[in-house]
Amino acid sequence: MLQTKDLIWTLFFLGTAVSLQVDIVPSQGEISVGESKFFLCQVAGDAKDKDISWFSPNGEKLTPNQQRISVVWNDDSSSTLTIYNANIDDAGIYKCVVTGEDGSESEATVNVKIFQKLMFKNAPTPQEFREGEDAVIVCDVVSSLPPTIIWKHKGRDVILKKDVRFIVLSNNYLQIRGIKKTDEGTYRCEGRILARGEINFKDIQVIVNVPPTIQARQNIVNATANLGQSVTLVCDAEGFPEPTMSWTKDGEQIEQEEDDEKYIFSDDSSQLTIKKVDKNDEAEYICIAENKAGEQDATIHLKVFAKPKITYVENQTAMELEEQVTLTCEASGDPIPSITWRTSTRNISSEEKASWTRPEKQETLDGHMVVRSHARVSSLTLKSIQYTDAGEYICTASNTIGQDSQSMYLEVQYAPKLQGPVAVYTWEGNQVNITCEVFAYPSATISWFRDGQLLPSSNYSNIKIYNTPSASYLEVTPDSENDFGNYNCTAVNRIGQESLEFILVQADTPSSPSIDQVEPYSSTAQVQFDEPEATGGVPILKYKAEWRAVGEEVWHSKWYDAKEASMEGIVTIVGLKPETTYAVRLAALNGKGLGEISAASEFKTQPVQGEPSAPKLEGQMGEDGNSIKVNLIKQDDGGSPIRHYLVRYRALSSEWKPEIRLPSGSDHVMLKSLDWNAEYEVYVVAENQQGKSKAAHFVFRTSAQPTAIPANGSPTSGLSTGAIVGILIVIFVLLLVVVDITCYFLNKCGLFMCIAVNLCGKAGPGAKGKDMEEGKAAFSKDESKEPIVEVRTEEERTPNHDGGKHTEPNETTPLTEPEKGPVEAKPECQETETKPAPAEVKTVPNDATQTKENESKA
């Protein structure tokens, strides 16, 4: 019965609802957490004054104008339900109920499902880790359904890498054991929900920070103090991120301030420069590198060395024969300097020691000096003080950095000490000084006495006294025998006095030298001798050699300087004839006069040997640096006069220059315009009628070429060298033309005359009957057809030594050899050829031919 009743009511309501139809659009809805959605409830029917209401899943009626779940009545036939920022609790069936004015109701429902969308709740980027630690990459995913998490790196699943260091934890975090710098990069955390086909991912940047490593380039740095130098300490640091650098000195931070003149940092602070290093900068410096991953430091020891410096010396004063005196020297420096002692004449510290107690005491062999050293202090003790100990003492402090020296002075007071030659020689009328040297401190007063009488006096008018700080000179001019004898020099100071007797002795002439040996040659002889046994009290000034041929009455003589002759004990006499017996004797000359003459010693000169000896060569460089004067010192001529010298020279490894022929009287040859900075060799041969000597050899080097400095910097000032040379050549040619024309008209000779004779048929100068002496070069018809030349010299020729009737070389002596081939004469155009040589060469008349012929026959 009850079921029937319910069915009746249902049919009633259905019949009524036909007129009120309720629809909700959309009919169902899914909302992701946090999203918003609205639903429209629409009523269809004729009912008026309808009431539309919304009910929550828990049956509560929803009121309008709420903030999160809002109900808005649009018009009589619709109403909107809006859910803002949905959450899980908002899920359920929402009902829209429409009530008519007759109380009838119609409703519609919508099932609202709220789900959590796949989202990343905690997956920060970047995530940083320290190299070497176990890194865990965080990625928290929220979703309604449990998601599947996949980790990817460089597009590949990290699990597929088969690297045991990569592990996905139970909370879906990715763990990398012992993470490396190479593991750095982008990692993708990817979530998937199979039921919804939903996928989402998050790229996480993984940064691996590397702890800094730091190393000092030099763990120990040495510097020298007080030289104004700078020193730079350098540390090399690596790490990621790039580490910042800082420095400490003995544990205290070094800060660079503005206008800091002591410390300078590089841009990255890896270098610390310390300016004007001094001893206070010696310390332990630490460079510190720091970044996110940690910090590390390195230590540098700065060792500052100092040059030695003498810090204390003191002058001392002592009395002669005092027991001892000590000189002290103190020095600073690092390393600790060693201190040595010396004077101007001796190195005390390097002398052999009688005893040496290291390191305190060193004693000289004579026990007179003792050196004691300890650390930076050294002392020099002198025992039994002598006046010769006075003077400068130099203390030198040395270490590996350098050295320093200071002088101190020891003043020794002592009574006068006199010195000087006791015996002084002179002769009547010859002025002489008697020297009395005085050593005294304090200075002494010097007096001269003669027979107890103070000098000078009225009785001795020929005496004068001259005093200097170190000596007194008694000038005596003896008038008679009475002026010779004893003279007394007395010196007095506050310490004591001293006297010294001098004897003025009358000098005598020297005894005779003794001839040991005579070494004869064909034209010279060397006399070896011993000096006189008695000089007469005064130095020998000269030696006199006398010689003559046996049977002659007249002695030839020559004076020789005593210093030069005494060096080898030899004098050389020249101008002798070959195969002739001579007697020679010697005498010595001093200020008093010529002494006894020695006994004569006979010798016989040798026959003519033929070739002369090679000359001795000495060079003297010119001021210009590329010229030289070679002096020719004549030696033995072999018994025949030297005709000429032949000179050849060249730069080493170069060709020989043309031979130069010098007359026999020449004593030098000038070589000019030589190559700069080149080594030259010179050969000189002497030639007489018997032949040539061996070559004398001389080697020299020219100077380096000086840098030319123009007199005027203007390039256009003055004429160039080429222009000047050109002008001179033009002038010279014009002069030659003028001279030739003059010769043509006045003497009927010259170039124009030759042209006139050969081309124009004019009669030459020979047509006028002039002989050979007036216009032609002389030729020797029977021997040589070369022109005879003369050599002008300033020296006289030496006499012939062979005793024959040889004609001596004179101004007409020919220098050409008769054995050479003839030269054809060109009388039409006779010209003189001049070759560059120190001697002047010219043609001479033919009458000189006979002289050459006679000389050749000799």
From Swiss-Prot:
Annotated Ig-like C2-type domain residues: 20-111, 116-205, 212-301, 308-413, 416-501
MF (Gene Ontology): virus receptor activity
PTM characteristics: Polysialylated at Asn-459 and Asn-488 by ST8SIA2 and ST8SIA4. Polysialylation modulates cell interactions by confering both attractive and repulsive properties that are highly regulated by ST8SIA2 and ST8SIA4. Polysialylation is formed on a-2,3-linked sialic acid of core glycans.
Positions annotated as glycosylated: 222, 315, 347, 433, 459, 488
Keyword annotations from UniProtKB, A to Z: Cell adhesion, Cell membrane, Disulfide bond, Glycoprotein, GPI-anchor, Host cell receptor for virus entry, Host-virus interaction, Immunoglobulin domain, Lipoprotein, Membrane, Phosphoprotein, Receptor, Repeat, Secreted, Signal, Transmembrane, Transmembrane helix
Record-listed Phosphoserine modification sites: 780, 784
Renumbered residue ranges of the record's region Disordered: 766-858
Cross-referenced InterPro entries: FN3_dom, FN3_sf, Ig-like_dom, Ig-like_dom_sf, Ig-like_fold, Ig_I-set, Ig_sub, Ig_sub2
Signal sequence region: 1-19
Pfam families for the chain: fn3, I-set, Ig_3
UniProt record, GO biological process: cell adhesion; commissural neuron axon guidance; epithelial to mesenchymal transition; regulation of semaphorin-plexin signaling pathway
Outcome of mutating residue 459 to Q: Loss of polysialic acid addition by ST8SIA4. Loss of polysialic acid addition by ST8SIA2. Loss of polysialic acid addition by ST8SIA4. Loss of polysialic acid addition by ST8SIA2. Decreases polysialic acid addition by ST8SIA2
Cytoplasmic side: 740-858
Sequence ranges on the Extracellular membrane side: 20-718
Sequence ranges of Basic and acidic residues compositional bias: 768-809, 817-834
Location of the Fibronectin type-III domain: 509-608, 611-706
GO cellular component terms given for this protein: cell surface; collagen-containing extracellular matrix; cytosol; external side of plasma membrane; extracellular region; Golgi membrane; membrane; neuron projection
S-S bridge residues: 41-96, 139-189, 235-287, 329-395, 436-489
Membrane-spanning ranges: 719-739
PANTHER family named in the record: BASIGIN RELATED (PTHR10075), FASCICLIN-2 (PTHR10075:SF100)
Protein's job: This protein is a cell adhesion molecule involved in neuron-neuron adhesion, neurite fasciculation, outgrowth of neurites, etc.
Subunit (UniProt): (Microbial infection) Interacts with rabies virus glycoprotein.
Protein name per UniProt: Neural cell adhesion molecule 1
Organism: Homo sapiens (Human)
Gene field: NCAM1
